[in-house]
């Protein structure tokens, strides 16, 4: 009896890593392959393709400091995780292991290489992440969402393929919804999100910006905002005082459909968010996460801003006054919103899951006729 080949998908436990892994998993299952997820404990809070019986948790640790103690802790956790991952490889015997970034992918990818199992890494950012960079010279193939990510690494170009970011079925469904240009006096739907982990800066800045918009826009505004539990009371109080039509929650499971129904999205610029905005084609105001060593979110936001699909505001400039000015200008110019939506869609790639699945099957030597 022939056993159906298994592909292990390794991803850090946040939406930006997990959602592309889920999208690839769906495509591989369509091709009659089995898939499992290898991740860290954070991923267990997400519902989706990977049920608990399809998920293996491997000990891992993100680098959180440069002190000897912090580095020693990280090293110990990664070593422990690699031992666990080696046992996993022996038990599961996967045909290939695919990494989607984040330090939790290091143990399974290292274990796969030690066992001679084919490996692929996918990076969704405009600047390759640190974990993937550590793995890049040791894997069989590299997939990137954007062209030119490794132009300064000539030794890696030969094994690099630009696939785009695999999109979940819900995003693909949302991408079929055309942008509904708002009327000059009709509802203006604004969605504020901070990534899968939320962003306190949105709770600090957005309510003050909304207050500065004034009564005519307050009456038009239909606001949906992701707000952490600890910030909920103070944010809600502002909107209730202004009588804003606002829906607040720590997390929206139906985010793809909310993206599709929005006129303006205010968000961080994680790779997954930028890819989804391109796939669906919606105008956005993007605030890159500051302080990152490689400034990946700044570069990600540039992908949309450079084609006119987004407004990029660095966090030091992200004030209530600045946001209110941008929102007022967009609300007064429906034609500009429509143009931004069309521009954003030009960077979307809807066939990325198929392209990445083709690469995986090639590396795993599963693409030959039976």
From Swiss-Prot:
<comment type="similarity">
    <text>Belongs to the glycosyltransferase 28 family. MurG subfamily.</text>
</comment>
<keyword id="KW-1003">Cell membrane</keyword>
<keyword id="KW-0472">Membrane</keyword>
<dbReference type="GO" id="GO:0051301">
    <property type="term" value="P:cell division"/>
</dbReference>
<dbReference type="GO" id="GO:0030259">
    <property type="term" value="P:lipid glycosylation"/>
</dbReference>
<keyword id="KW-0328">Glycosyltransferase</keyword>
<dbReference type="InterPro" id="IPR004276">
    <property type="entry name" value="GlycoTrans_28_N"/>
</dbReference>
<keyword id="KW-0132">Cell division</keyword>
<dbReference type="GO" id="GO:0050511">
    <property type="term" value="F:undecaprenyldiphospho-muramoylpentapeptide beta-N-acetylglucosaminyltransferase activity"/>
</dbReference>
<feature type="binding site">
    <location>
        <position position="125"/>
    </location>
    <ligand>
        <name>UDP-N-acetyl-alpha-D-glucosamine</name>
    </ligand>
</feature>
<protein>
    <recommendedName>
        <fullName>UDP-N-acetylglucosamine--N-acetylmuramyl-(pentapeptide) pyrophosphoryl-undecaprenol N-acetylglucosamine transferase</fullName>
        <ecNumber>2.4.1.227</ecNumber>
    </recommendedName>
</protein>
<dbReference type="GO" id="GO:0008360">
    <property type="term" value="P:regulation of cell shape"/>
</dbReference>
<dbReference type="GO" id="GO:0051991">
    <property type="term" value="F:UDP-N-acetyl-D-glucosamine:N-acetylmuramoyl-L-alanyl-D-glutamyl-meso-2,6-diaminopimelyl-D-alanyl-D-alanine-diphosphoundecaprenol 4-beta-N-acetylglucosaminlytransferase activity"/>
</dbReference>
<keyword id="KW-0961">Cell wall biogenesis/degradation</keyword>
<dbReference type="GO" id="GO:0005886">
    <property type="term" value="C:plasma membrane"/>
</dbReference>
<feature type="binding site">
    <location>
        <position position="196"/>
    </location>
    <ligand>
        <name>UDP-N-acetyl-alpha-D-glucosamine</name>
    </ligand>
</feature>
<dbReference type="GO" id="GO:0071555">
    <property type="term" value="P:cell wall organization"/>
</dbReference>
<comment type="pathway">
    <text>Cell wall biogenesis; peptidoglycan biosynthesis.</text>
</comment>
<keyword id="KW-0133">Cell shape</keyword>
<keyword id="KW-0573">Peptidoglycan synthesis</keyword>
<feature type="binding site">
    <location>
        <position position="297"/>
    </location>
    <ligand>
        <name>UDP-N-acetyl-alpha-D-glucosamine</name>
    </ligand>
</feature>
<dbReference type="Pfam" id="PF03033">
    <property type="entry name" value="Glyco_transf_28"/>
</dbReference>
<keyword id="KW-0131">Cell cycle</keyword>
<feature type="binding site">
    <location>
        <position position="168"/>
    </location>
    <ligand>
        <name>UDP-N-acetyl-alpha-D-glucosamine</name>
    </ligand>
</feature>
<feature type="binding site">
    <location>
        <begin position="14"/>
        <end position="16"/>
    </location>
    <ligand>
        <name>UDP-N-acetyl-alpha-D-glucosamine</name>
    </ligand>
</feature>
<dbReference type="InterPro" id="IPR006009">
    <property type="entry name" value="GlcNAc_MurG"/>
</dbReference>
<keyword id="KW-0808">Transferase</keyword>
<dbReference type="GO" id="GO:0009252">
    <property type="term" value="P:peptidoglycan biosynthetic process"/>
</dbReference>
<dbReference type="GO" id="GO:0005975">
    <property type="term" value="P:carbohydrate metabolic process"/>
</dbReference>
<dbReference type="Pfam" id="PF04101">
    <property type="entry name" value="Glyco_tran_28_C"/>
</dbReference>
<comment type="function">
    <text>Cell wall formation. Catalyzes the transfer of a GlcNAc subunit on undecaprenyl-pyrophosphoryl-MurNAc-pentapeptide (lipid intermediate I) to form undecaprenyl-pyrophosphoryl-MurNAc-(pentapeptide)GlcNAc (lipid intermediate II).</text>
</comment>
<keyword id="KW-0997">Cell inner membrane</keyword>
<dbReference type="InterPro" id="IPR007235">
    <property type="entry name" value="Glyco_trans_28_C"/>
</dbReference>
């Amino acid at each position: 009896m022939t056993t159906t080949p298994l592909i292990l998908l390794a991803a850090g436990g946040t939406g930006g890593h997990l959602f592309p892994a889920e999208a690839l998993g769906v495509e591989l299952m369509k091709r009659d392959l089995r898939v499992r997820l290898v991740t860290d404990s954070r991923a267990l809070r997400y519902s989706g393709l990977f049920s608990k019986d399809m998920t293996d948790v491997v000990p891992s640790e993100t680098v959180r400091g440069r002190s000897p103690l912090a580095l020693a802790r990280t090293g110990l956790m990664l070593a422990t995780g690699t031992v666990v991952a080696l046992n996993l490889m022996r038990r599961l015997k996967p045909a290939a292991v695919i990494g989607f970034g984040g330090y939790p992918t290091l143990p399974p990818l290292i274990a796969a290489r030690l066992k001679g199992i084919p490996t692929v890494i996918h990076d969704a950012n405009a600047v390759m992440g640190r974990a993937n960079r550590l793995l890049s010279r040791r894997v069989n193939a590299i997939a990137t969402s954007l062209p030119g990510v490794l132009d300064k690494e000539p030794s890696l170009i030969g094994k690099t393929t630009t696939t785009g970011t695999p999109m979940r079925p819900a995003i693909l469904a949302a991408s079929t919804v055309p942008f509904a240009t708002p009327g000059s006096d009709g509802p203006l739907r604004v969605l504020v999100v901070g990534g899968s982990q939320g962003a306190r800066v949105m709770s600090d800045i957005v309510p003050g910006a909304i207050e500065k918009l004034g009564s005519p826009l307050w009456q038009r505004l239909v606001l949906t905002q992701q707000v952490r539990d600890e910030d909920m009371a103070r944010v809600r109080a502002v909107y209730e005082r202004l009588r804003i039509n606002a829906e607040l929650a720590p997390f929206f499971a139906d985010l793809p459909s909310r993206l599709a129904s929005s006129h303006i999205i205010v968000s961080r610029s994680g790779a997954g968010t930028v890819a989804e905005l391109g796939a669906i084609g919606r105008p956005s105001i993007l605030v890159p996460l500051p302080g990152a060593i490689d400034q990946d979110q700044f570069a990600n936001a540039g992908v949309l801003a450079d084609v006119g699909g987004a407004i990029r505001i660095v966090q030091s400039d992200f004030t209530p006054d600045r946001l209110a000015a941008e929102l007022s200008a967009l609300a007064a110019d429906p034609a500009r919103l429509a143009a931004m939506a069309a521009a954003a869609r030009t960077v979307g790639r809807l066939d990325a899951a198929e392209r990445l699945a083709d690469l995986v099957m090639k590396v795993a030597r599963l693409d030959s006729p039976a």
